[in-house]
Amino acid sequence: MNIKASRIKELETLCKNIREEILRVVSKNGGHLSSTLGATEIIVAMHEVFDSKKDPFIFDVSHQSYAHKLLTGRWDKFDTLREFNGLCGYTKPSESEHDYFVAGHSSTSISLGVGAAKAIALKGEQNSRIPVIMIGDGSMTAGMVYEALNELGERKYPMVIILNDNEMSISKPIGAISRILSSAMASPFYQNFKKHTENFVDNFGDGARYIAKRMEESLKLITPGIMFEEMGIDYIGPVDGHNIASLIEILQKAKELKKPVIVHAQTLKGKGYEIAEGKDEKWHGVGPFDLDSGAASKKSSAKSATQIYAEALLHLAKNNDKIVGATAAMPSGTGLSELIELYPNRFWDVAIAEQHAVTSMAALAKEGFKPFCTIYSTFLQRGYDQVIHDTCLMNLPVVFALDRAGIVGEDGETHQGVFDVSFLRAIPNMTLFAPRDEKSFHQAMAFAAQYQFPCSLRYPRGSFTQTSLPESSPFELAKSQLLQSNKGDVLFIGYGNGVGRAYETSKLLEEKISILDLRFIKPLDKEMLRDMATKHNKWFIFSDSAKMGGVGSAILEFFADEKILHVELESFEYEDSFITHGKTKDVEESLGLLPAQLAQKVKALI
């Protein structure tokens, strides 16, 4: 493919302008930065060779798709990135016809590509359409990728898979697969070749050394592709992911092959922003920052729930060598980085492998250890069968610590942690509880550490809602805490961070209100609930979880069992819909869940 030099110059300028716009907006709004900057030339080349209106453009996770948004008619709206009612930080078909599929969770792209390729074949459109996938090296650590590659290699559907290799998942990529992709020279085949060749050529002089050197350089290029070639998928690379002319030429050749091809492109994370170039996970996802210095624009004064969890777990681990733990590619986000560094034989980042994380922790529990499986609420969805089959069926004492429970803000629909109460409550042998503040969190962790059955505790992104309620008492199984007692008809029941919302709402009302920290949703404190039913006949539930199957549902089931018919119950949980992105306050306001809005609803109902 002969591309005019003038066109290449135009595209290089376009890449520069795209990076400048991404930096300008992300420094203001926050967002995903390093991988986005690094992927710019790849995305521009994709749009030069393929047609995103007809060719399915599939971005794995899609947090690196900002350049794609800018190239598909959204430049004038890019200022609204991740804002409420603005552009989503991920691909979203309802936002643009150029976005093929919703994304946000890792390692789904190749399966989507296989499905799209099957549909294209069934429609007889293989001469006019081809799936184009961009996937990062971090996503290549998840098993779903290899399930898809396994079928793809067998069926040979035409597809171009661009492996964006910047050696950067959210944290350092973990495992054998990452080593294959990031360091061909580390392979035993290559090392053995080098060792034996050096011994051999010593006897044959400079000519043999020259030939051996050329063979060695060739093997550096061949080794990463062996795995894919053995699966039946053509491999091209590694190639320079920032050479726009080369990328266009290679993608055109890959397109013309009419079979599955992996193009291995090596990129520099943070490309174009010197402060972030090649840096670690700090620049993966960022809040607003000063573009000149790179300093964060503002820092929260309140301690985050994640920090509290990390401190509590560290304290427990120092005093009990049976405590172990795992996270799935989120050591920094979940607060486990320090524990992994201090106790590398007891705490592990297992890569993007939630199923494996859950089941491996179950085996540790079987062997007498006390595992803390630390995962974002939204990502435990990916290990649900393992929670049921490998943990609860065996009744093993694994603690599931669910970070980012509730609304997570700008990451939106794919990341909201609202379903865990509903999907975990249905599992036999599972105990569910939640702290409301820092002290109760430490007490909840102390309870979890000694509990001999499966359990889960949830906590929000950011800090807990601050209150002046009475101090928390130690956690006991199925025991709630009455925080405020009055003789009126109204009872507010809070669960987890919902306790703070209940308290803030109560301050806006003139009525005398009792407030109960439920603490345990499974099992419920039936004795306390029976007593409350004799004193209050208007109950209001506050929880940052889904209404369907949630806290209100659990209490209504209790009413049905106990034949309690006189209590009126209203639940302020999330309705049956996916929750959009935006600052948490803006999203909650749109749902009518700010304290002032809730106070008005309560007034209307009492």
Curated annotation (Swiss-Prot):
It catalyses: D-glyceraldehyde 3-phosphate + pyruvate + H(+) = 1-deoxy-D-xylulose 5-phosphate + CO2. GO terms for molecular function: 1-deoxy-D-xylulose-5-phosphate synthase activity; magnesium ion binding; thiamine pyrophosphate binding. SMART domains: Transket_pyr. GO terms for cellular component: cytosol. Pathway: Metabolic intermediate biosynthesis; 1-deoxy-D-xylulose 5-phosphate biosynthesis; 1-deoxy-D-xylulose 5-phosphate from D-glyceraldehyde 3-phosphate and pyruvate: step 1/1. Binds 1 Mg(2+) ion per subunit. Mg(2+) binds at residues 137, 166. It is an enzyme of class 2 (transferase). Thiamine diphosphate binds at residues 63, 104-106, 138-139, 166, 273, 354. Pfam families: DXP_synthase_N, Transket_pyr, Transketolase_C. It comes from the Bacteria. Its EC number is 2.2.1.7. Keywords: Isoprene biosynthesis, Magnesium, Metal-binding, Thiamine biosynthesis, Thiamine pyrophosphate, Transferase. The keyword Transferase applies. GO terms for biological process: 1-deoxy-D-xylulose 5-phosphate biosynthetic process; isopentenyl diphosphate biosynthetic process, methylerythritol 4-phosphate pathway; terpenoid biosynthetic process; thiamine biosynthetic process. Its cofactor is Mg(2+); thiamine diphosphate. PANTHER family: 1-D-DEOXYXYLULOSE 5-PHOSPHATE SYNTHASE-RELATED (PTHR43322), 1-DEOXY-D-XYLULOSE-5-PHOSPHATE SYNTHASE, CHLOROPLASTIC (PTHR43322:SF5). Homodimer. HAMAP family: DXP_synth. Belongs to the transketolase family. DXPS subfamily. Catalyzes the acyloin condensation reaction between C atoms 2 and 3 of pyruvate and glyceraldehyde 3-phosphate to yield 1-deoxy-D-xylulose-5-phosphate (DXP). This is 1-deoxy-D-xylulose-5-phosphate synthase.
